């Protein structure tokens, strides 16, 4: 993805890997769009790699960030990333463009009250 951003004109020193920070995206890049006005082009990029034709999954945090950051949030999907001809697809504002197509899959862990009571044991004085 760094190579793609470099090809798009983003300076290497202005491309950051931020995935470990749990910000809702993997890369942050910025560049001067217009030197006269000082306008800056900012991209917050979530990267997904999947076999061609397979759905991608965004975390709740990633989806909410896509909604919040709108035009500055980009989804980069690499189809067949381990194949001979990986194909990069870029989508600016994925929330705005894909909200109609998303399917929400909610996962949680339900623990019965009885199990909680049984596992709690006696309360010991401090």
Predicted regions and their residues:
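A short acidic/basic microdomain associated with nuclease active sites
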Residues: 3-33
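Conserved catalytic cores of phosphodiester-cleaving nucleases, focusing on short active-site segments
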Residues: 5, 27-29, 41-51
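A structural signal for short secondary-structure junctions
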Residues: 21-22, 36-39, 68-71
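Short, solvent-exposed loop/turn segments that connect beta-strands within catalytic domains
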Residues: 33-41, 83-86
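Short beta-strand-loop-alpha-helix junction that forms the active-site gateway
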Residues: 47-64
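Conserved RecA-like P-loop NTPase helicase motor core
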Residues: 62-66, 74-76
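Domain-level recognition of nuclease-like catalytic cores that cleave nucleotide substrates
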Residues: 72-126
């Amino acid at each position: 993805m760094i190579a793609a951003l470099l090809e798009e004109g983003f300076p290497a020193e202005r491309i950051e890997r931020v995935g470990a920070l749990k910000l809702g995206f993997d890369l942050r890049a910025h560049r001067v769009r217009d030197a006269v006005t000082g306008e800056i082009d900012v991209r917050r990029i979530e990267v997904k790699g999947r076999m061609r034709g397979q759905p991608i999954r965004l975390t709740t945090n990633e989806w909410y960030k896509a909604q919040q950051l709108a035009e500055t949030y980009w989804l980069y999907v690499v189809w067949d990333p381990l194949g001979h001809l990986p194909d990069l697809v870029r989508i600016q504002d994925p929330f705005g463009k894909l909200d109609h197509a998303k399917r929400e899959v909610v996962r949680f862990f339900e623990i019965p009250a009885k199990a909680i009571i049984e596992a709690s044991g006696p309360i010991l004085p401090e």
